[in-house]
A protein has these predicted regions:
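Active-site neighborhood of HAD-like aspartate-dependent phosphohydrolases
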Residues: 1-43, 49, 55-57
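Non-catalytic pre-domain segments flanking phosphatase-related domains
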Residues: 1-6, 62, 219, 224-238
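A short, structured active-site edge motif that brings together acidic residues
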Residues: 38-39, 43, 67-68, 129-142
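Helix-loop "lid/cap" segments that line or gate small-molecule binding pockets
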Residues: 48-62, 151-154
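Metal-dependent phosphoesterase signature
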Residues: 56-99
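Substrate-recognition element of Asp-dependent hydrolases with the DxDx(T/V) motif
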Residues: 93-124, 136-142
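Conserved Lys-Pro-Asp/Glu-containing loop-to-beta segment of HAD-superfamily phosphomonoesterases
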Residues: 145, 149-177
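Acidic, Mg2+-coordinating phosphoryl-transfer loop and its flanking beta/alpha structural elements
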Residues: 168-206
Length: 238
């Protein structure tokens, strides 16, 4: 069985910074302070890392309770904030997910720094929610490596996971670190906040400008392309 662990922002989709409205409004409501999330380089940061950094920059006492309130209000505001910018699903993503959907030799999990609520809002808005029945989220941790360990444990509940048949797909050095932490391969894509050169410096297994087209992606992760499977079925029926 091939196992794929997918990041969201910059890998599956871009909100075109639509989520920043929700964060800035949440900070204003809860702290009374003005804040612009665009002042941070957030690719690769978890929602709770963003909360902690926000408090630090505003000179507020960092507390789990305040971080929790910020994140929960952000989740509530996110569905109405996303339409304020024209985000989109990134190249080849929908086609690849469609090609994987009905296969029995591969399973996809989310492995994301979003909380479950944030991930659900984004995937629902961009029409990708049905491709991901489950995953590991940043519910109570700031560390991506912890999320990766949880994602791997989730996959192992369904059966053995071979290192050479398991892949993290992501767009930041943090995703590469996560893959290394759990001993699987990284497919890095430069569709987020980092260039191919920046990603390559962290030694991913493979790096691309964007997610490869369907057949190339399937071959990359060791799966026969749909065309080959169709030919095999025709030969068998003949």
């Amino acid at each position: 069985m091939t196992v794929l662990f997918w990041d969201i922002d910059g890998t599956l989709l871009t909100t075109a910074k639509g989520g920043m409205f929700a964060w800035d409004d949440a900070v204003k409501e809860i702290t009374g302070r003005d804040f612009q999330l665009q002042t941070l380089r957030i690719p690769g940061m978890t929602d709770y890392q963003i909360a902690a950094k926000t408090c630090e920059l505003l000179g507020l006492e960092r507390s789990e309770e305040l971080a929790h309130r910020l994140v929960r209000r952000y989740e509530e505001l996110l569905p109405s904030s996303l339409p304020r910018r024209t985000g989109h699903v990134l190249p080849n993503v929908r086609e690849v997910l469609e090609a994987l959907r009905d296969r029995t030799d591969v399973v996809s999990y989310l492995r994301t720094g979003n909380t479950r609520g944030g991930a659900t809002a984004k995937l629902t808005h961009y029409g990708l929610i049905d491709f991901f029945p489950t995953g590991a989220f940043a519910e109570d941790t700031k560390e991506r490596a912890t999320i990766a360990v949880r994602a791997l444990a989730l996959a192992r509940e369904a059966g053995p996971v071979a290192e050479d048949h398991a892949f993290v797909i992501g767009d930041t050095p943090h995703d590469i670190e996560c893959a290394n932490a759990i001993g699987v391969r990284t497919i890095a894509v430069a569709t987020g906040g980092y260039s191919v050169e920046e990603l390559r410096a962290h030694h991913p297994w493979r790096v691309f400008e964007a997610l490869p087209p369907v057949d190339e992606f399937l071959r990359l992760v060791g799966l026969p392309p749909a065309s080959a499977r169709a030919s095999a079925r025709q030969a068998h029926s003949a």
